[in-house]
Amino acid sequence: MLIDTHCHLDAPEFDEDRDAVITAARQAGLGAIVVPAVFRRNWDTVQALAEREPDVWFALGLHPLYVNDAGPDDLEHLRQRVMAVRDHPRFVGIGEIGLDYFVPGLDLARQQAVFEAQVRLAAEFGLPVILHTRRSVDAVTKQLRRFRPPSGIAHAFNGSPQQAQHLIGLGMAIGFGGAMTFDRARNIRRLAASLPAESLVLETDAPDISPAWVHPGRNQPAELARIAQVLAELRGLSLEAVAELTTANAARVLPALRLTGAGAPANIGSD
């Protein structure tokens, strides 16, 4: 079984064929898909998707790319929503949250304030975090050290080995996906090959970050089987071993997956 720890399955790119996309994921061997929210207006959507589909889990949060549009009461609404769903069997934690120092025109002070409040919230309720760390790993790590949420995932990580080790030491797993499939992504591929096996999880970030064989087309969770095969080749492991270790890692850092049973075992295909 494979777990896609980061997929925006609620995105409009899937509106015309979402059911088929989910079916294809199951046929490819996926037993769980984690769908993080990005702003207040899709909180209902990701929760409803998780409640409708037996292999979908959800997270709630405010993504750094959308904080300029966040309302003054969004953080309080997030707190109230988290209090309401913290015992929901499909709720994995707070995400997607973090900092983005790459996209121009964002209010960095606003990003920082919103991120800090969400990390504090995760720590208060003992919830994992799903992190956006683009060009911002050190600043994100600083807040993790300060508030100490119990676990989480650094999604689409592309920092240094030292930065990765700091995150791992704080209970985070490191997410690898489509970017790893490009030969030119040397840093990401080195990280995937060399970081501790217990730190690795898989993701698609679909419909974004398409793997090499799909780029520039739409990504989808079914591609995770071939992404897992790339990781297996980089580490000199079998596909089955990679599936087993990344699934165990995902369930460790997102305990709701383990507590509610992240899908039934399935054959892993690469078609």
Residue ranges of each PLM-predicted region?
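Mid-domain alpha/beta scaffold segments of enzyme catalytic cores
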Residues: 1-271
